[in-house]
């Protein structure tokens, strides 16, 4: 069938298998061009199919020669219905890893569940023995608690005040003001339950108890801090409450791993177009401005540049780039005072008329479609493609 993009709000409901494969190949080519680094050899990535998690898997495998186990929740293509981008990304990753003799195994299921944790542990025990790095890169709208069965939904809201903030309606391509009511205490608690550090901690405890964490094993979870412009909706809002929970829980996890020479760190990455970030009301406008300013400065980076740099500069470097809270920082180019000042200066100047002139909304749209395998150079989008692409060595839970 011929697959075209169908966008609904902040999600594209179709994905292109060939486009996704080329995307993955370009990321592999990038990390190889940076040369190998002395990094992890057996890696578990929780949330491995898109965005930063996928980049973490690619960099570990193709620049450090790691065997990888990936956990994700994606949908395969069936009949004339395309699968999700994450499915096609993972199929491509497996294909390229296998071609180079790199071990790759994946688990498709709910990472919050005990069943998926157990299945993952069984695979590690059987095939790898242990892992020396666990990357936690999960973005999910809801979580069923594995012990109580309670379902929590996350919300994107400010805390303690109504927020009036400029935003960009990406469908209509107009600037509009978003009015967002503050979260209730229950909404805050639910968001922390979904996006905080409890599940990360549960994973590490389960892996540790099963004896599949190697001596000296490291773990990292990804976060975003941002600057003043994004603080009200992000760092000082419900998502921020969840991210602050990560900062608390990492201390306990670090203590647990340090006993055997290991370490646990929260890693701060830059703002990027991902399926997760496009859902945040003011993010498309912020990103469109940020892209414009950073590209002009020559400091713009995508997922793969960020994560590959995180491995080389911090996770596997004797002199990691770290802040006073002990977080690894890969977002310093975004937060450079001159970059932020220019974004802030342009923020109120953007109108419907000058949107394409003052911002890089064109680049934003292009990056958004690329997430789903569209608008990738060298791909024939009129060609017939089979939406059913198998993933070898996949366990369905």
Swiss-Prot record:
Pfam families: Eno-Rase_FAD_bd, Eno-Rase_NADH_b, Enoyl_reductase. GO terms for molecular function: enoyl-[acyl-carrier-protein] reductase (NADH) activity; NAD binding; trans-2-enoyl-CoA reductase (NADH) activity. It comes from the Bacteria. Substrate binds at residue 224. The keyword RNA-binding does not apply. One of its GO terms (biological process) is fatty acid biosynthetic process. Pathway: Lipid metabolism; fatty acid biosynthesis. Its EC number is 1.3.1.9. The active site is at residue 234. InterPro entries: Eno_Rdtase_FAD-bd_dom, Enoyl-CoA_Rdtase_cat_dom, FabV-like_NADH_b, Trans-2-enoyl-CoA_reductase. It is an enzyme of class 1 (oxidoreductase). The record marks 74 as: Plays an important role in discriminating NADH against NADPH. Signal peptide: none annotated. It catalyses: a 2,3-saturated acyl-[ACP] + NAD(+) = a (2E)-enoyl-[ACP] + NADH + H(+). The keyword Mitochondrion does not apply. Keywords: Fatty acid biosynthesis, Fatty acid metabolism, Lipid biosynthesis, Lipid metabolism, NAD, Oxidoreductase. NAD(+) binds at residues 47-52, 73-74, 110-111, 138-139, 243, 272-274. Coiled coil: none annotated. Monomer. HAMAP family: FabV_reductase. Belongs to the TER reductase family. Involved in the final reduction of the elongation cycle of fatty acid synthesis (FAS II). Catalyzes the reduction of a carbon-carbon double bond in an enoyl moiety that is covalently linked to an acyl carrier protein (ACP). This is Enoyl-[acyl-carrier-protein] reductase [NADH]. It comes from Methylobacillus flagellatus (strain ATCC 51484 / DSM 6875 / VKM B-1610 / KT).
């Amino acid at each position: 069938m011929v697959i075209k993009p169908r966008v609904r709000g902040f999600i594209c409901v179709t994905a292109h298998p060939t486009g996704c494969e080329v995307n993955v190949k370009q990321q592999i080519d990038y990390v190889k061009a940076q040369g190998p680094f002395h990094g992890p050899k057996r890696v578990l990535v929780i949330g491995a199919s898109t965005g930063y998690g996928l980049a973490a898997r690619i960099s570990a495998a193709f620049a450090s020669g790691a065997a990888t186990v990936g956990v994700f929740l994606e949908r395969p293509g069936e009949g004339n219905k395309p699968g999700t981008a994450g499915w096609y990304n993972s199929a491509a990753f497996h294909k390229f890893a296998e071609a180079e003799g790199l071990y790759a195994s994946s688990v498709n299921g709910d990472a919050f569940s005990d069943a998926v944790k157990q299945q993952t542990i069984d695979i590690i025990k059987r095939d790898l023995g242990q892992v020396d790095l666990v990357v936690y890169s999960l973005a999910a709208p809801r979580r069923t608690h594995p012990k109580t069965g309670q379902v929590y939904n996350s919300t994107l809201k400010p805390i303690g005040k109504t927020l009036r903030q400029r935003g960009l309606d990406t469908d209509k391509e107009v600037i509009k003001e978003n009015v967002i009511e503050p979260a209730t205490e229950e909404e805050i608690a639910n968001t922390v339950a979904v996006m905080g550090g409890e599940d990360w901690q549960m994973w590490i405890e389960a892996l540790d108890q099963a004896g599949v964490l190697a001596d000296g094993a490291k773990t990292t979870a990804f976060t975003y801090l941002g600057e003043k412009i994004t603080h009200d909706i992000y760092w000082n809002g419900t998502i921020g409450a969840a991210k602050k929970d990560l900062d608390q829980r990492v201390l306990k996890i670090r203590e647990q791993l340090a006993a055997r020479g290991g370490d646990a760190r929260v890693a701060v990455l830059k703002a990027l177009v991902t399926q997760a970030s496009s859902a945040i009301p003011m993010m498309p406008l912020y990103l469109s401005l940020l892209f414009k300013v950073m590209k002009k400065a020559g400091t713009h980076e995508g997922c793969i540049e960020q994560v590959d740099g995180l491995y080389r500069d911090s996770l596997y470097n004797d002199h990691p780039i770290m802040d006073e809270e002990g977080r690894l920082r890969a977002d310093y180019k975004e937060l450079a005072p001159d970059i932020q000042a220019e974004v802030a200066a342009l923020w109120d100047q953007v109108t419907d008329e000058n949107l394409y002139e003052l911002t890089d909304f064109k680049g934003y749209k292009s990056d958004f479609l690329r997430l789903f395998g569209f608008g990738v150079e060298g791909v024939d989008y009129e060609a017939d493609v089979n939406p059913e692409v198998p993933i070898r060595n996949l366990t369905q839970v």
